[in-house]
Amino acid sequence: MTLFPRIASGGALFLLGAVGAWAQSDAKDLYMDKCAVCHGADGAGKTAKGKKLKLKDVHETAAKMKADEMVKIVENGKPPDMDAYGKQFNAAQIKGLVEYYRSLAK
């Protein structure tokens, strides 16, 4: 293997690690800023907006939905109540949000 492919593959691994580190460290902040107003800090959906929308508790949602289904809902929304965030957030951010939300059920 020549030097360039080694450097390129090492750089790619570094970037993947950086994305993973972002998802772990900042997903909670993003969730609290954008999601908790409806879903609640604990994922219970017991906020004023959550009650109005009749949101389900994270324990029920996480048990019934796979992570990839949740990713699609965050990306595309769930009209009429859930806005789409696919244009606001990148794939790593959305994945991090879903992972953080699901972690609230543990």
Q: Which residues does each predicted region cover?
A:
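Electrostatic cytochrome c docking/interface patches
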Residues: 15-30, 46, 67
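Electron-transfer interface patches adjacent to heme c in soluble/periplasmic c-type cytochromes
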Residues: 56-68, 85-93
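Post-cleavage N-terminal segment of exported redox proteins
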Residues: 1-24, 100-106
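C-terminal capping alpha-helices of c-type cytochrome domains
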Residues: 73-75, 80, 86-106
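Periplasmic/extracellular electron-transfer cofactor-ligation site
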Residues: 28-54, 76-80, 103-106
